Amino acid sequence: MKIAYDAKRAFHNSRGLGTYSREVIRLMNAYFPDNDYYLFNPKRKNAIELAPGANNTILYPESLWHRKFPALWRTFGISRELQKLKADVYHGLSQELPARIQKTGVKSVVTMHDAIFMRYPHLYPKVYRKIFIEKNKYACMVADKIIAISLQTKKDIVHYFQADENKIEIVYQGCSNIFRQQINEEEKVRVREKYSLPQQYLLNVGAVEKRKNIELIIKALHHGKINIPLVVVGKATAYMQELKQLLTQFGLEGSVIFIQDAATTDLPAIYTLAEIFIYPSVFEGFGIPVLEALCTATPVIAATGSCLEESGGPSSLYVDPYDVAAMSAAINIILADGHLQIKMKADGLKYAEKFSDENIANNLMRVYKNLLP
C-alpha cells in the first residue's frame, strides 16, 4: 500500500501536533513495514529528525514558486503529487486536506484534534480563526474518513463543522515510547542535578498559555498553604509573565520553578521525580501530557469539562477548572495518603496500556484498509 502524509508538523513542530504526526509515522513503519510511506515536507531547513523508516520517502516542493511559498504547495500542489505517485491513501495529520483532493482518486483521511478555537474565539486572532474554520470545514466535508482523537473531539466537529457522524472513527493517540521505559536511579540523579529540581515538587508540562490555566495551581498553593514547589516545563510566553505577577501578589516568588529548555529525553525523569502531575487546562482535544504522566507512574490531577477523563482514566482525580478550593483539596489528599499514591500509580499504568503502540497502529491501519476495495 502507498500511504502519504502531510508531514509539516512532524518535521517542524516539537510538541502537540508534531508529536502526534511523528508517532503516527513511527508506528506505521514499525508495525507495517511492507508499505511505502510518502512524507510531504514543505521546508528542508530546520527539520526535526524523524525515527528511521526504511520505506519513508520525503517529498519537497520542486518549483521555485512553491519553494518560495510552501503554504501554496501544501494547499494546491500536493494533490497533483498524489496523482503522480498513484497513492492509495492520503492522511492529513493536522486538520487539513489539500484542495481538490476529492478529484485525485486517492482516498483521504483527516485527523481532527479539537475545535478549541471555536469554543474560545477570544484566545485566537480573528484572521487565524477565519482561515482555520474554512480549512476545517473543507477537510470534514471532503474527507473519506475522519479520525477524531477523542469522543469530545467527535462531538465538537459534528457540532461546529457539521461533520458526518458516519465518517468519523475515534482513534486515540499515544505518546512516545520514552515515557514507557524504566528510569534508573543514575538517570534520576542526573536530571535532578541538571535542572536543580527540589526533592519534592508538583509538575505541569506543556504550552504555557492562558487556556492551560496554570494560575489555578498557583491559587491552590496559596489557598491551601501547600509548601511543595511547582515546576512548570514550557517555553516562555506572555502568560508566563502573568503567572509571575500572580506569584508576586501572593508572595510565592520562590514556589514556582520555570524550566524553558527541557530536553524531550529528560522529560520521563522529570515526570517520574514529581509527586503529582497537574493539568488544569480548561479545554483539550486529548491531553498527551496526561498520558505521559500515567506512563511514568505519576499520579494525575486534571480538569473536568473536556476530554481529560478519557486520557486520564478512572484512577486520576478531576476538579472543576475554576474551583481553587477543590484543586487545593485534591493536591492535599494525594500528598497525605501514601496508599492512594501507590494505587494511582499502578492503576494509571494499567489504564495507559489502552493507548499502546500496537493498539493505535492497528486501529489506524483498519481505517486505511476499510477505505480500499
What are these regions (language model features)?
Residues 1-373:
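Carbohydrate transferase catalytic cores enriched for Leloir-type hexosyltransferases
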